[in-house]
Structure formats: structure tokens, C-alpha cells
Amino acid sequence: MNALFLLKSKATVSVCYDDNTVRRGMESLRDSGFSAIPVITRSGDYAGSVSEGDFLWFLFDNPDAKPESVRLSTILRKGWNPAVTVNVTMDDLMQRAANQNFVPVVDDRNKFIGIITRKDILAFFYGQEESGRNGTEGP
């Protein structure tokens, strides 16, 4: 099974840019309705992901900081929610989904191409399990 089958393309995913301000990032996250959002560079590289908790801790740890003056790139946690390439296995996706709401996907040049959600990963595996029980072939 090719993981691209589950991909939500960049065009349909809410993202922030690493040069946005923290305030703009918070607004984008609120508007998205999600608890975390991918962050990319202006050239399309995946820079990381930012969560509600990242914003909360930034405000808590920096009470005098002005969110409209601080770049989003300064609050990104290194190594959190790392991206996978299109060659990722379904087993690797399942392992990532245990700890992440979505898995960012990049091409071989680290260009962000979209996400695969935990919901879609679980639905895929549930479908495989169901088809095995019914004696039919899965997706």
C-alpha cells in the first residue's frame, strides 16, 4: 500500500510559515480548528509543527514578550513531529500515529507535500482488519 493514497495535499492543509509572528501562528491555529499545524518555509521546506502547547509555554515562559514581534521559528521544538518521505511504510505510519495527530510528508528535497492524519491511518488499518475477517481483500 502506497502512503500517498492517504495523503491530504498541501493545498488542502492549513499551514503556518516560519517567518510568521507568534501571534499570526496562534491565529492560524485557531482558524484551523486543530491542536497542531505544520510550519513551512517560504520556499516550501518543512520546518516543523507547532501546537497549542507550544504557544502556551511561550507565553508562560516569556510574559513580557510581544507575540506580534517574535517569529514562529523561534518557538519550534527541534525534532518534534518529524516528517516522513513518500516511501514510508504503513507500519511506520502507525507507529508515528500513536504519538502524533498527523504525520507530515515531504518529498526527497524536504519540500512539504501534505499530511496523513491519524484518523486516516486508523481507518486504513481498520479496513484491512475488517476485510480480513470478511475474507475480502482490503484497499
Predicted regions and their residues:
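Bateman (tandem CBS) regulatory domains
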Residues: 1-13, 68-80
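The conserved cystathionine-beta-synthase
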Residues: 15-33, 40-43, 82-100, 106-109, ...
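Short beta-to-alpha loop/turn elements within the nucleotide-binding domains of ABC transporters
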Residues: 20, 50, 70, 88, ...
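Short beta->alpha transition motifs characteristic of CBS
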Residues: 34, 38, 46-62, 99, ...
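Helix-adjacent hinge/juxtasegments
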Residues: 40, 61-71
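Regulatory sensory and allosteric helical modules in signal-transduction proteins
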Residues: 58-61, 75-84
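Short acidic DE-rich linear segments
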Residues: 132-139
